[in-house]
Curated annotation (Swiss-Prot):
GO terms for molecular function: ATP binding; cysteine-tRNA ligase activity; zinc ion binding. It holds the Pfam family tRNA-synt_1e. Belongs to the class-I aminoacyl-tRNA synthetase family. Keywords: Aminoacyl-tRNA synthetase, ATP-binding, Cytoplasm, Ligase, Metal-binding, Nucleotide-binding, Protein biosynthesis, Zinc. Binds 1 zinc ion per subunit. This is Cysteine--tRNA ligase. It comes from the Bacteria. Residues 436-461 are annotated as: Disordered. SUPFAM superfamilies: Anticodon-binding domain of a subclass of class I aminoacyl-tRNA synthetases (SSF47323), Nucleotidylyl transferase (SSF52374). The gene is cysS. Its EC number is 6.1.1.16. Monomer. A motif ('HIGH' region) lies at residues 33-43.
Length: 461
């Protein structure tokens, strides 16, 4: 099967066939977390969406022919504030390290529980200050940046087609949208590339004094370092289109003299919680950790595969309402799928075609459910189901049980058989119910040779 991958490009507002710059090295960059606080459920969506795309690209082009870079922003004013709040007795750099390490470690645990593969590279902003300074110097040399008010700023008027991603005319890009308007700026939309640091802020030596980079230049430097001046796909949440991605494009194109930064720009939709915008003031703010390990949402903990499937049941470009009802629906669906091991079999064509159509995970999940139903009655379909489920990252795993537990279950099953022989049906039913509560599903039958009653059991998902 020759798969034709089509992706919706925010830059063109069209869905078109994807053609990589180099099929031997398909390159994708996705904006990762700012590690000042635990990731919330909205942060989980791009991680899951682009993990599916990563899996699909590896399937199409080969596992060794895809480079996926997802950064960690460990340099931000929010991090500084959290460090001063949580570790007031530590030196600043030690406090910042404590915050970023704890938060990044938790992020890695969270996304692993959501079934996400590790990206090929995961650069941290603080390791690429030299690359950021180099880009800023090039922008100044080329007339796209200037120093004013203790800052180095990008001159948005110096770029004729600034705003092509968001389609916002420059005159409309005034204050707001995380772009501060200050008197020393040439234009209201000019944004910070470098700013001076006080004694209570982290800083690095630069041609413009001790300071730190602006938010946008960080991703330009890291993407360029690992993927080159022009690469294939850049992804992130819808909220990053402006100003972050718009400004990434401006910096990278003007520094390198290219027509594009990435050929395809992809953005996932917003996440609401129980019909409302998620916010701490609304009381519906929930982290991935809380969903996995506490009873904050729906009065119980939720398995990572349930959270993942719940996300994939809506197309990535559509808004999603994250609710207990949605999670219960995803859990019911998963409970009907057979457990399986990873398979080298060919994935189902219907699932592949759905994913190749701009990551239509809704259609892919529907096709996978039909395949699961077939595999439940025809074991020969199980390898295709396993291969297809792995593309979505929702392959139900066989659960290994301790030998002592297996022996205990076998003993109860045998006891129930004895109760049935003795016509003590009430006790047999009680034992069945007891096993069911422990997640054990019984299947009664008859031995073909002796005609005696038999019972097999399996662990329910």
């Amino acid at each position: 099967m020759s798969l034709r991958l089509k992706l919706h490009n925010t830059l063109t507002r069209e869905k078109s066939e994807f053609a990589p710059i180099d099929a031997d090295n398909v390159r994708m960059y996705v904006c990762g977390p700012t590690v000042y606080d635990f990731a919330h459920i909205g942060n989980a969506r791009p991680v899951i969406v682009f993990d599916v795309l990563f899996r699909l690209l590896r399937h199409v082009y080969g596992e060794d022919h895809v480079t996926y870079a997802r950064n960690i922003t460990d340099l931000d004013d929010k991090i500084n504030a959290r460090a001063l709040r949580d570790y007031p007795h530590l030196p600043l750099n030690d406090a910042i390290h404590a915050v970023t390490k704890k938060t990044a470690d938790q992020f890695h645990d969270d996304v692993a529980a959501l079934g996400c593969l590790q990206p090929t590279v995961e650069p941290r902003a603080t390791d690429y200050i030299a690359e950021m300074i180099y880009l800023i110097e090039r922008l100044i040399e080329r007339g796209h940046a200037y120093k004013a008010g203790g800052e180095v700023l990008f001159d948005t008027r110096s770029m004729a087609d600034y705003g092509q991603l968001s389609k916002r005319p420059l005159d409309e890009q005034q204050a707001g949208a995380r772009v501060a308007v200050e008197a020393h700026k040439k234009n209201p939309g000019d944004f910070v590339l470098w700013k001076l640091s006080s004694e209570s802020e982290p800083g690095w030596e630069s041609p413009w004094g001790l300071g730190r980079p602006g938010w946008h230049i960080e991703c330009s430097a890291m993407a360029g370092r690992y993927l080159g001046e022009v690469f294939d796909i850049h992804g992130g949440g819808l909220d990053l289109i402006f100003p972050h991605h718009e400004n990434e494009i401006a910096q990278s194109r003007c520094a390198h003299g290219t027509h594009v930064m990435a050929n395809v720009w992809m953005h996932n939709g917003f996440v609401q919680v129980e019909g409302r915008k998620m916010s701490k003031s609304e009381g519906n703010f929930v982290t991935i950790y809380e969903l996995l390990h506490t009873d904050k949402f729906g009065g119980r903990q939720w398995p990572g595969e349930v959270l993942r499937l719940a996300m994939l049941m809506t197309h990535y470009r559509e808004p999603i309402d994250f609710s207990v009802k949605r999670l219960e629906e995803a859990e019911r669906l998963l409970s009907k799928w057979p457990a399986a091991e990873t398979s080298d079999a060919a994935a189902d064509e219907t699932v592949l075609e759905a994913l190749a159509d701009d990551l239509n995970t809704v259609a892919a999940v529907q096709a996978l459910h039909a395949l699961a139903h077939a595999a439940n009655t025809d074991p020969s379909r199980l390898p295709a189901f396993a291969a297809s489920a792995a593309l979505l990252g929702v392959l139900p795993k066989k659960t290994e049980m301790d030998e002592a537990i297996v022996s205990a279950v076998d003993a109860l099953v045998e006891l129930r058989l004895e109760m049935l022989k003795a016509k003590n049906f009430a006790e047999a039913d009680r034992l069945r119910d007891e096993l069911s509560e422990k997640g054990i599903q019984l299947k009664d039958g008859k031995d073909k040779e002796t005609g005696e009653r038999t019972t097999t059991w399996e662990l329910k998902r």
